[in-house]
Amino acid sequence: MGQKINPLGFRLGTTQSHHSFWFAQPKNYYKGIQEDQKIRDFIKNYVKNNIIISPDTEGIAYIEIQKRIDFLKIMIFIGFKKFLIENRQLGIIKEALHIDLKKNFHYVNRKLIIDIIRITKPYRNPNILAEFIADQLKNRVSFRKTMKKAIELTESEDTKGIQVQISGRIDGKEIARVEWIREGRVPLQTIQAKINYCSYMVRTTHGVLGIKIWIFIEKE
């Protein structure tokens, strides 16, 4: 039987890099990983609950964390089109995040730096595309129409190929199934091919749907 591997882990060190940068004793690795996950979840929940996002606005692409003993730097890469453009507004959000993170994670003797960086081509990032698809499915838009629209968005940003897969009780059908669509090339077995990937879960009125996206950007 064929064995599946995470496309990002498969390419670490070649076309993909880590989003966490720190060192620890082997026995303390799990603590560092747990802290990173809590920070990422906290930031995503903060954005979801405190920032009004317009329909044509993308979300968080990914979060990079750099840690030392007395230093913590968090870089939030976002794809907002019309939001977070003004420096004043950006400063207010960064300051609020700074205060809440220090309060919730008890960073007293640790310098905390937060940077919010806007990515130029948001729909090359599968996380942002998955959020778009999830939003459409929640609003009961046809899954075929949604997948075709997702492909159009990525094609407009110089991608070489995309594959979208949706699984679960699609359109409220009683029997779960898997539907997928591919456009262009998606060479999953080529290590040198730079492929961005994400797995996303969305809750709808008919149950949970799984979304998987592979985007082939370039070959290095």
Curated annotation (Swiss-Prot):
SUPFAM superfamilies: Prokaryotic type KH domain (KH-domain type II), Ribosomal protein S3 C-terminal domain. PROSITE patterns: RIBOSOMAL_S3 (PS00548). GO terms for molecular function: RNA binding; structural constituent of ribosome. It is found in: Plastid. CDD domains: KH-II_30S_S3. One of its GO terms (biological process) is translation. It comes from the Eukaryota. Its main location: plastid. GO terms for cellular component: cytosolic small ribosomal subunit; plastid. Pfam families: Ribosomal_S3_C. Keywords: Plastid, Ribonucleoprotein, Ribosomal protein, RNA-binding. Residues 39-120 form the KH type-2 domain. Part of the 30S ribosomal subunit. Belongs to the universal ribosomal protein uS3 family. This is Small ribosomal subunit protein uS3c.
